[in-house]
A protein has these predicted regions:
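Sec-dependent N-terminal signal peptides
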Residues: 4-14
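Subset of outer-membrane beta-barrel
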Residues: 18-268
Length: 268
């Protein structure tokens, strides 16, 4: 009951900021939502520049149960298709139900500028629909991203979401946040990597995100992380079977509780 009351109080916030970059995939979610330097199919969401490092066609599907409430569940689908000149990606993300449906579909592209620098872009179509004949509003946003690899152990990622500060509806001031992420990933060994990122929404304080991924034995990954403002710890694991990757994570909000995530990746 207390959680539902808090959700009710915070619902205007979700309505206003629902079209930002929601966490997807299950892998990054287990590492404090640090995904800037991860080259898998979900790079279409976190850093399109990392798509350029993919070598095969990849698919992804995920579901996140935000605060264990079905009405706030996040569904996402993704595909990445490498070509000789770069990698194209397509992603759909939706959250809500019949009364409130917030969705985003985006087309992205990542290319190599050199052996050490990748560039990425993405265009999104946003749609917010309110039930009971309250109508629908929509708009288009852009994303820009970079990935630098100064050494074999260090990667530096940058991602800018909605740099033009586009709104869903100027009349009702329905905003789509403008968000910047900057991060570093360090490969301690073949079994351990660590990520540190800083996120800044122009309307909110800085958030620091940290995560680690450990590969103790074949076919198993263990993950943990934390993000600030508010402080949200997370844990997760990944299982590998052939070309399939199953990722599970769970994050804990101090007031609203658990948010489990499940993702499946497949590469041809």
């Amino acid at each position: 009951m207390n959680k539902l009351f808090l959700i009710f109080l915070l619902f205007p916030f979700f309505l206003n900021a629902g079209n930002d970059n929601l966490p997807v995939g299950g892998r990054a979610s287990g590492m404090g939502n640090t995904g800037l330097c991860i080259a898998d199919v979900w790079a279409i969401r976190f850093n399109q520049a990392a798509l350029a490092d993919l070598r095969s066609v990849s698919f992804g599907v995920s579901y996140e149960s935000r605060f264990l409430l079905r009405s706030l569940g996040v569904q996402s689908l993704a595909v990445a298709i490498p070509t000789k000149r770069g990698t194209f990606g397509l992603n759909y993300t939706g959250t809500g139900d019949q009364l409130y449906l917030d969705s985003k579909i985006g087309l992205g592209y990542g290319m190599k500028l050199s052996e050490k620098i990748n560039l990425g872009i993405r265009l999104n179509y946003h749609s917010l629909r309110l039930g009971n004949n309250y109508g629908r509003t929509q708009n288009i946003t852009a994303e820009l991203s970079l990935l630098a690899k100064p050494t074999d152990k260090i990667q530096i990622g940058f991602h800018l979401f909605n740099p033009t500060q586009t709104k869903l509806n100027d009349y009702q001031n329905e905003e789509i946040p403008a968000i910047m992420n900057l991060g570093v990933s360090y490969k301690f060994s073949e079994k351990v990597r660590g990520n540190v990122e800083i996120e800044k929404d122009i309307e909110l304080p800085f958030s620091v995100k940290m995560g680690v991924e450990y590969f103790p034995v074949d076919n198993l990954y263990i993950r943990a992380g934390i993000s600030t403002n508010p402080s949200i710890p997370s844990i997760g694991f990944g299982l590998v079977k052939g070309e399939f990757n199953l990722d599970f994570s769970s994050a804990f909000h101090p007031a609203l509780g658990l948010t489990p995530s499940l993702g499946l990746r497949y590469s041809l």
